[in-house]
């Protein structure tokens, strides 16, 4: 992706988030974006929208189906995307919208990787650690299980990481022995 395309994507995302923020509709916008992104993942819609082989009329039909129960701001955004024929960038724009919402609301997704699934008590402790160490509000808690960690956990928030895994400790110990 070129810098020009990236700037375009970011500008669309910022504009949508600004409008939703002015009207105190960030939560509704975030729900809409997450639902549409889920549709992209389950249907490979991104390939259809970015394909030159799919006629513009078909792309219009596909995006019209996405307009269902969305907020007015999301539907207007989708109309704007269609008018300007930017459907190929929609998936990246929606990802950028989530990033902008996180920045504006200081609420970031938290990814926790552990060797075993977390209990509810552990999840609440993770949220407390995130609030204290990173000075952000925890958004969605995305849990991943990786038995190769052996024990401990890895918390990732806004490109910052806390790694207390036994795997990392063993790697550090191995490096110290060299």
Swiss-Prot record:
Tell me the disulfide pairings in this chain: none
- Asked if the Swiss-Prot or TrEMBL record annotates the protein with the keyword ATP-binding, the reply is no
Supply the InterPro entries for this chain.
Answer: ATP_synth_OSCP/delta_N_sf (IPR026015), ATPase_OSCP/dsu (IPR000711)
The superkingdom listed in its UniProt entry is Bacteria
Gene3D superfamilies in alphabetical order: N-terminal domain of the delta subunit of the F1F0-ATP synthase
State the PANTHER family in the record. ATP SYNTHASE DELTA CHAIN
How is this protein organized at the quaternary level? Answer: F-type ATPases have 2 components, F(1) - the catalytic core - and F(0) - the membrane proton channel. F(1) has five subunits: alpha(3), beta(3), gamma(1), delta(1), epsilon(1). F(0) has three main subunits: a(1), b(2) and c(10-14). The alpha and beta chains form an alternating ring which encloses part of the gamma chain. F(1) is attached to F(0) by a central stalk formed by the gamma and epsilon chains, while a peripheral stalk is formed by the delta and b chains.
Name of this protein: ATP synthase subunit delta
Originating species: Streptococcus pyogenes serotype M1
């Amino acid at each position: 992706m070129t810098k020009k395309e990236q700037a375009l994507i970011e500008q669309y995302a910022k504009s949508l988030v600004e409008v939703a923020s002015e009207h105190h509709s960030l939560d509704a916008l975030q729900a809409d974006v997450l639902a549409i992104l889920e549709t992209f993942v389950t249907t490979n819609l991104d390939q259809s929208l970015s394909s030159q082989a799919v006629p513009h009329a078909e792309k219009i039909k596909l995006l019209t189906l996405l307009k269902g129960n969305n907020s007015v701001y999301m539907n207007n955004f989708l109309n704007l995307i269609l008018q300007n024929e930017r459907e190929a960038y929609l998936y990246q724009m929606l990802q950028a919208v989530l990033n902008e919402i996180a920045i504006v609301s200081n609420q970031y997704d938290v990814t926790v990787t552990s060797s075993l699934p977390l209990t509810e008590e552990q999840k609440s402790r993770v949220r407390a650690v995130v609030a204290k160490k990173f000075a952000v509000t925890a958004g969605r808690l995305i849990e991943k299980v990786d038995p190769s960690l052996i024990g401990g956990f890895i918390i990732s928030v806004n490109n910052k990481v806390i790694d207390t895994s036994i795997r990392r400790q063993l790697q550090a110990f191995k490096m110290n022995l060299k």
